[in-house]
């Protein structure tokens, strides 16, 4: 079998930067799926992407499909020949359809009889005749929400396409992609590079870089930008703030990255750095620079898409562009400082949170009361919690947050400090929204936790209370994120809070707003479902989660302790046998009619094995009681694992359902007592 390397490139107008990686990865995944379906062997495959191109490279691709032997089964021998042994019309028709005579057919014997069969050799199709159609199907399946047309063509794609190149080794593959005929011409950088004729698939990256002035390898371009930005920051005694999301976007915006350093007036540093960083990152795609102490420097790093003879001119241009945005931030900050956050409370009455749940003023009133309630249970300062809850949304009415929306909470913190609020109140203003995304940190300050929980629970109970629970993928109020936030805050801070109590208080504060009588139960179920999903994402086995869920613990911190304990129990040698024994006990007890016996009469313990089990339980119970009381479930299950030998011997020697009613009930009481000890933690009978 011979092999060649394949190169496919699509030359386009500027592709959406935030979609570039996904488009390229999907193109590659779709195409390699096509190769697999076509039984075309290859060694490896890679994708390339730049603002004006998508490309894939397949190494050591078979130049043709392998020949195949295809078994074509005909009629059964019993119906293929008549009484005189002559072929029937059915046999002749089948043979004729396969281009053979009946005499040329072979016979296949199976357990269901004997059949005529023809093993036809099917020659593999040349790869070059398949590539264009496969590439087109791969493009057709790309995740493009809003495709567009261009010119007079009816072809649709995410952006207009100008060139298509398909090379198998040095051979140009004929065909079209998105209405563009395959050709060797590859476009270079819009200003710096030249177009060229690609002679061989292997030369794509090299020629594109040397002649086209385009670094098509996305990961190489990204690494180059990061390294150069870090060097540039170090030269001015700082560290560049290079978040991966912004780095990805910048990488998707440039074909030939040139990293430059610029500056802005130091007077702007009087504005909270978060606002300056927001506009530098969000609006301008710049990398801010911080000193060793984490203080923002009056510099920024940006990436040009051209190697200029006069870089100072490009630097000056970017400084000129960013200055008005920084001046806006300065103006908003100075204007906002003239009014306290408390003075903005009346304006919250003009903003609707939700038609049935009232205004933002109504919401902060509820948050304030609920935050104080939570603070009392966690030992936090309830006065600060109530104050922070009341002010929690006031910064939404400031000029700064209206213009730079992502600074909500953060600017509230700065304004609260300027107003003379306590540090706990100020910090809660910022941390109320945490965690904002998967992997984000949770608030740790006690008042911040109370306010963050109150905000999320108020939304959850309110939206469920008006019958607008999330359905399918739709979640307009981000309730799934709120639910995970509630659970993470409680678990990671080990807060002694009960979900039932919190939900009931939130429901009480909503008063007559809620129309759904089942809201509290639905919110609890929703939180439990999020709990399960969260633990599954962390790699916890489903049966461990179900074993704990069976006990319906409604204190998240306690729930987490049980999960950890059962996970540890699974690692013990005795766990499988005890889980099986618990399942057996559960099945026996489930068949008992009426109330289960609980009192164990030692005088009725007739067999040595039941005496030993009862004695072992009696020995363990004084040790277990304080462990259960202190939620030391891991140690409790470790102690219970010592029951394995006694339990195994019991089931080997003792007939539980004895004819003697007193003996039977006493043994049932013993098993019930055994099971109850495990149920203090989880239903381990559900462990697989």
From Swiss-Prot:
It catalyses: tRNA(Gly) + glycine + ATP = glycyl-tRNA(Gly) + AMP + diphosphate. It comes from the Bacteria. The keyword Transmembrane does not apply. Pfam families: DALR_1, tRNA_synt_2f. GO terms for biological process: arginyl-tRNA aminoacylation; glycyl-tRNA aminoacylation. SUPFAM superfamilies: HD-domain/PDEase-like. One of its GO terms (cellular component) is cytosol. PANTHER family: GLYCINE--TRNA LIGASE, CHLOROPLASTIC_MITOCHONDRIAL 2, GLYCYL-TRNA SYNTHETASE. This is Glycine--tRNA ligase beta subunit. The gene is glyS.
């Amino acid at each position: 079998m011979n092999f060649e390397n394949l190169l496919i490139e699509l030359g386009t107008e500027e592709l959406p930067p935030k979609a570039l990686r996904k488009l390229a990865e999907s193109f590659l995944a779709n195409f390699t799926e096509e190769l697999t379906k076509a039984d075309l062997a290859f060694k490896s495959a890679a994708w390339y992407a730049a603002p004006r191109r998508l490309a894939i490279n397949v190494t050591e691709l078979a130049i043709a499909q392998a020949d195949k032997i295809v078994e074509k089964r005909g009629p059964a021998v019993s119906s293929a020949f008549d009484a005189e042994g002559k072929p029937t019309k059915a046999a002749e028709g089948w043979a004729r359809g396969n281009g053979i005579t009946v005499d040329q057919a072979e016979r296949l014997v199976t357990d269901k009889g004997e059949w005529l069969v023809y093993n036809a050799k099917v020659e593999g199709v040349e790869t070059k005749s398949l590539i264009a159609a496969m590439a087109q199907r791969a493009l057709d399946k790309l995740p493009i929400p809003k495709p567009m047309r261009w010119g007079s063509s009816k072809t649709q794609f995410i952006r207009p396409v100008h060139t298509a190149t398909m090379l198998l080794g040095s051979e140009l593959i004929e065909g079209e992609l998105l209405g563009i005929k395959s050709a060797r011409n590859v476009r270079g950088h819009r200003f710096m590079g030249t177009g060229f004729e690609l002679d061989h698939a292997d030369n794509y990256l090299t020629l594109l870089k040397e002649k086209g002035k385009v670094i098509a390898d996305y990961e190489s371009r990204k690494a180059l930008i990061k390294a150069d930005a870090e060097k540039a920051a170090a030269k001015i005694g700082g560290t560049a703030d290079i978040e991966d999301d912004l780095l990805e976007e910048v990488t998707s915006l440039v074909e030939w990255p040139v990293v430059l350093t610029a500056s802005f007036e130091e007077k702007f540093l009087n504005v909270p750095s978060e606002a300056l960083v927001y506009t530098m990152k969000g609006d301008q795609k710049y990398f801010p620079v911080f000193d060793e102490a984490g203080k923002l420097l009056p510099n920024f790093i940006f990436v040009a898409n051209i190697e200029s003879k006069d870089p100072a001119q490009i630097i000056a241009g970017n400084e000129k562009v960013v200055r008005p945005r920084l001046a806006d931030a300065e103006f908003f900050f100075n204007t906002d400082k003239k009014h306290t956050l408390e003075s903005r409370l009346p304006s919250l009455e003009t903003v609707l949170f939700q038609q049935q749940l009232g205004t933002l003023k109504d919401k902060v009133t509820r948050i304030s009361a609920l935050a104080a309630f939570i603070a009392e249970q966690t030992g936090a300062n309830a006065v600060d919690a109530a104050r922070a809850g009341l002010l929690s949304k006031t910064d939404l009415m400031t000029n700064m947050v209206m213009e730079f929306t992502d600074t909500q909470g953060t600017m509230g913190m700065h304004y609260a400090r300027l107003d003379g609020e306590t540090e706990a109140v100020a910090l809660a203003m910022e941390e109320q929204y945490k965690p904002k995304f998967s992997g984000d940190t949770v608030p740790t300050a006690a008042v911040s936790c109370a306010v963050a929980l109150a905000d999320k629970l108020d939304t959850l109970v309110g939206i469920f209370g008006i019958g607008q629970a999330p359905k399918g993928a739709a979640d307009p109020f981000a309730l799934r994120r709120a639910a995970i936030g509630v659970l993470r805050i409680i678990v990671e801070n080990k807060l002694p809070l009960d979900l039932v109590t919190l939900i009931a208080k939130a429901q009480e504060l909503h008063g007559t707003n809620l129309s759904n009588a089942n809201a509290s139960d639905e919110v609890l179920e929703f939180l439990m479902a999020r709990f399960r999903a969260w633990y599954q994402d962390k790699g916890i086995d489903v049966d461990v989660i179900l074993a704990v869920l069976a006990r319906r613990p409604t204190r998240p911190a306690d729930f987490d302790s049980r999960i950890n304990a059962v996970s540890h129990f699974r690692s013990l040698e005795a766990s499988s046998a005890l889980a099986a024994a618990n399942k057996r006990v559960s099945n026996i007890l489930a068949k008992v009619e009426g109330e289960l016996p609980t009192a164990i009469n030692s005088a009725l313990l007739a067999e040595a094995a039941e005496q030993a089990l009862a004695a072992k339980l009696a020995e363990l119970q004084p040790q277990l009681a304080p462990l259960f009381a202190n939620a030391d479930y891991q140690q409790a299950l470790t102690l219970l694992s010592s029951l394995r030998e006694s339990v195994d011997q019991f089931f080997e020697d003792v007939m539980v359902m004895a004819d003697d009613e007193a003996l039977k009930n006493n043994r049932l009481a013993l098993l019930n007592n055994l099971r109850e000890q495990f149920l203090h933690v989880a239903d381990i009978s559900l462990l697989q």
